[in-house]
Amino acid sequence: MKYRHSFHAGNFADVHKHIALLALLRALKKKGKGFLYLETHAGRGSYDLSGHPAEAAGGVGRFLEAQHEAPELREYAAVIAALRARTARRHLYPGSPLVAAAELRAQDRAVLIELQGAEAHALEQSLSTLADARAGGLPVRVERGDGFLRLKAFLPPPERRGLTFVDPPYEETQQDFRQVTAALVEATRRFPTGVLAAWYPIKDERTIGPWQSECLRALRAALASPPAVLASELWLYPRDSRVALNGSGLLIVNPPWLTLERMQVWLPELQASLTTSADAGSSTRMLSESDR
């Protein structure tokens, strides 16, 4: 499976991951001390949806048409509207780097890693547009390289607070799953108190449970005190279909206080805003000892 950010921009998986990302960032901002936001596979930062691609129409398009009760959903819609206004691009869809950059305070900073040169250049352009509208610019650094390999260079951060976001393209699905597992272990070993979120595609349900169990085993083997791990999943199609992307998953290591409880509120509401299909569903739970 290949999940390239530009091809799938604005689809249901993006909406899921970006709402969760925004909620995690705002949880970190509840304390005054600064933090590092580190992203391993940043992409180009923003996408033009003026052609109304089908995936975006069924994702962020449908989301923005709905009325929302959960604050997390309303806040995400407001972030999109604000970024479109600040950049004067009415069809802009902000990727995770722009969502994060717009949230940073003066005491926070971000390191965004991107392997592809053209994508990294486009990311710098996206950020410069945003920086022009902010006094003092953005505390953001773009690094060109392999995010899996470069991750360890930035952890632990001197701030001792941070969020690492791992979102590879899954061009080589099984290899990327293995690399995500290794990244989870490496990042948590270097920065045991840091928050880490890793996105994964749900295509063949039979592979997800064993992979989650392997992540837990690897964390337990590497760390004297294994961290709490939350799994959040949203699917719009039968989980065992092998035709296309069926669902979106996030593993969150060291989830901030109330992340589980709040996600159990807003994720079902998000699902209902995107589809009424009986095949759809959502789940948010802590991975437990029995899952190992």
Name each region found by the language model.
Residues 1-292:
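Class I S-adenosyl-L-methionine-dependent methyltransferase catalytic core
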